[in-house]
């Protein structure tokens, strides 16, 4: 009986604990500041090409790019290109940062009817892809990963902003 109860409790914890933490965090976002970080490669031409591709994808969905404003979308790309070994590795991380208020300060400002000025920068969305590729296909595979992450972001953005589909 005791083992059965433990199994039921653990099952319920797993079922309820798998919800996405970033649900509805992208609601109302129409302007973003793009930050692109490439670590491990010194290829400025490829970097500019990828940034242009990302900006064009945002224009396709009518998301405007602005300078020095929150929310900020960050593409962090870490590449370990090994010409000696057969495989090279990469990590592509897409994160969205926005201002937030701690729960304590939020409730305190409700009680005081004053708007708090203690804003924090918080990660409101994040997804990443870790992959391996040959050196010949490394750029192509990193670009495919960027495109997959962008598509995942847009899917979540449409879920949070359903009226933007029309």
Placement of each model-derived feature along the sequence:
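Extended rod-forming repeat segments used as scaffolds/tethers
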Residues: 9-10, 62
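A structural "domain/chain start" motif
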Residues: 4, 14-56, 155-166
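C-terminal/domain-edge helix-coil "capping" segments
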Residues: 19-24, 105-166
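Generic N-terminal leader/processing signal
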Residues: 1, 16, 62-63
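Long, continuous compositionally biased terminal/linker segments
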Residues: 76-126
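Sec-dependent signal peptide hydrophobic core
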Residues: 2-9
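A short, hydrophobic beta-strand-centered structural micro-motif
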Residues: 31-35, 56-98
């Amino acid at each position: 009986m005791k083992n059965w109860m433990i199994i039921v409790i653990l099952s319920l914890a797993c079922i309820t604990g798998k919800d996405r933490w970033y649900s509805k965090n992208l609601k109302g976002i129409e302007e973003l500041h793009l930050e692109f970080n490439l670590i491990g490669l010194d290829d400025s031409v490829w970097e500019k090409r990828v940034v242009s591709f990302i900006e064009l994808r945002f224009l396709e969905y009518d998301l405007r790019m602005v300078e020095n404003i929150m929310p900020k979308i960050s593409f962090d790309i870490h590449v370990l290109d090994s010409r000696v070994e057969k495989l090279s590795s990469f990590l592509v991380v897409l994160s969205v940062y926005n201002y937030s208020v701690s729960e304590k300060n939020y409730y305190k400002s409700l009680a005081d009817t004053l708007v708090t000025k203690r804003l924090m920068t918080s990660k409101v969305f994040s997804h990443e892809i870790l992959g391996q590729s040959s050196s010949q296909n490394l750029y192509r595979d990193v670009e495919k990963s960027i495109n997959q992450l962008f598509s995942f972001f847009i899917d979540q953005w449409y879920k949070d902003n359903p009226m933007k589909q029309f």
